[in-house]
Swiss-Prot record:
Superkingdom per UniProt: Bacteria
Signal peptide: none
Annotated protein name in UniProt: Putative iron-sulfur cluster insertion protein ErpA
One Pfam family this sequence matches: Fe-S_biosyn
PROSITE patterns linked: HESB
UniProt record similarity statement: Belongs to the HesB/IscA family.
Organism placement in taxonomy: Bacteria, Pseudomonadati, Pseudomonadota, Betaproteobacteria, Burkholderiales
SUPFAM superfamilies: HesB-like domain
Functional description taken from the UniProt entry: Required for insertion of 4Fe-4S clusters.
Cofactor remark: Binds 1 iron-sulfur cluster per subunit.
Subunit structure: Homodimer.
InterPro entries attached to this UniProt entry: FeS_biogenesis (IPR000361), FeS_cluster_insertion (IPR016092), FeS_cluster_insertion_CS (IPR017870), FeS_cluster_insertion_RrpA (IPR023063), HesB-like_dom_sf (IPR035903)
Positions with a binding annotation for iron-sulfur cluster: 44, 108, 110
Cofactor(s) named in the record: iron-sulfur cluster
Length: 116
């Protein structure tokens, strides 16, 4: 039996992020898409965030649903994202997804890489 971890998450998936993801999924025309957020080695601070669409929920994924949008985080990335907020900003600096991560001890100027 394949069991996908679905538990209350200390990760915040903001309304604005969920609304933007829903808009992007609608543009793609594939209602099976889910937003996958991950952490990988790289960037100027050691780790960097990644965002992609995925149709598949893996066994070790933690899932969250907000406003009908499903967010997926693999178990390795989850440990770095506990307590973080995944948000979408549209301001003078531009429109982008941002992660506010209290686990990041340092971040680079662009905010896309960090060390923990």
């Amino acid at each position: 039996m394949n069991a996908v971890a679905e538990m209350p998450s200390p990760i915040v998936f903001s309304d604005s992020a969920a609304m933007k993801v829903a808009e992007l999924i609608e543009e793609e025309g594939n209602p099976d898409l889910k937003l996958r957020v991950f952490v990988q080695g790289g960037g100027c601070s050691g780790f960097q965030y990644g965002f992609t669409f995925d149709e598949i929920v893996n066994e070790d994924d933690t899932t969250m649903t907000k406003n009908g949008v499903q967010l997926l985080i693999d178990s390795m990335s989850y440990q770095y994202l506990v307590g973080a907020e995944i948000d979408y900003k549209d301001d003078l600096e531009g429109a982008q997804f941002v992660i506010k991560n209290p686990n990041a001890t340092t971040t680079c100027g662009c905010g896309s890489s960090f060390s923990a």
